[in-house]
């Protein structure tokens, strides 16, 4: 067992039913050490594939690449699900820290000379490999992914490409967190029956619960999709629908700490450079 695994459920076998993550034992502080270990393991696997002295084959190169990084994939999928469904300031801090690091790891893989040389050799000789259609398509897709991710870039341009990708990961993460902050902070309070007109019971129940959670006497519509979409669908009040809709389309588009407009400009500039 890895030295960092003690006390970290993300680095121990998941002996739960169906191999599901042990959600009750997982804390935000477990993720960065788990990512550290998983990235190191993945790099070792990629280095081993790239340095394999045997001639490249589909099995020892493409299939081996596909099998690599399983722990990183498991931790990453779990983290992504939590940040998209039950996030918190602590998880968002981890997300901001890890986004550029994970992007840098991806760039390192796609620009790994040894691995790409083996994939390229197989791709150039694919007509003579007598592969079935499915593995042949996998080979073609992986080769295309590497080329599009900068595998053929050399020298200073390669280093700059990696920097651009890391910055884009940081910016897009901040963009998403700003939108989420606006969604969670917005409150459309409905206090009388006329303001609830047209809303079915399931929408009313969700709005009542949102009010209770926020200590507000009344029903509350937030900008989470589970609130605002049913409200826009069923509400009889055109004026209230308009207020909610305008708030929805203005997320991250206003002065203040959650203003996404300068972030969007930088993202566009970097994507132009990336292209």
Predicted segments, located by residue:
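Zn2+-dependent metallopeptidase catalytic domains
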Residues: 1-275
């Amino acid at each position: 067992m890895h030295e960092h695994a003690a006390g970290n459920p993300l680095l121990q076998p998941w002996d739960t039913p169906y191999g599901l993550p042990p959600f009750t034992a997982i804390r935000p502080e477990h993720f960065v050490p788990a990512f550290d270990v998983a990235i190191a393991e993945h790099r070792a696997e990629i280095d081993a594939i790239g340095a394999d002295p045997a001639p490249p084959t589909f099995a020892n190169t493409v299939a081996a690449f596909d099998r690599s990084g399983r722990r990183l994939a498991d931790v990453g999928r779990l983290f992504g699900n939590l940040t998209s469904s039950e996030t918190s300031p602590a998880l968002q801090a981890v997300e901001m820290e890890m986004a550029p690091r994970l992007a840098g790891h991806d760039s390192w893989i796609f620009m790994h000379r040894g691995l790409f040389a083996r994939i390229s050799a197989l791709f150039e000789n694919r007509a003579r490999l007598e592969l079935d259609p499915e593995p042949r398509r996998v080979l073609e897709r992986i080769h295309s992914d590497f080329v599009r991710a900068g595998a053929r870039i050399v020298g200073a341009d390669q280093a700059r490409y990696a920097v651009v990708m890391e910055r884009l990961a940081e910016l897009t993460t901040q963009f998403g967190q700003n939108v989420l902050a606006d969604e969670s902070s917005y409150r459309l309070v409905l206090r009388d029956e006329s303001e609830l007109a047209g809303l079915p019971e399931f929408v009313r129940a969700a709005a009542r619960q949102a009010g209770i959670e926020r200590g507000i006497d009344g029903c509350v519509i937030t900008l989470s999709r589970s609130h605002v979409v049913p409200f826009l669908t069923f509400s009889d009040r055109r004026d209230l629908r308009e207020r909610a809709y305008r708030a929805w389309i203005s997320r991250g588009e206003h002065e203040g700490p959650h203003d996404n407009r300068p972030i969007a400009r930088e993202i566009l500039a970097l994507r132009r450079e990336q292209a």
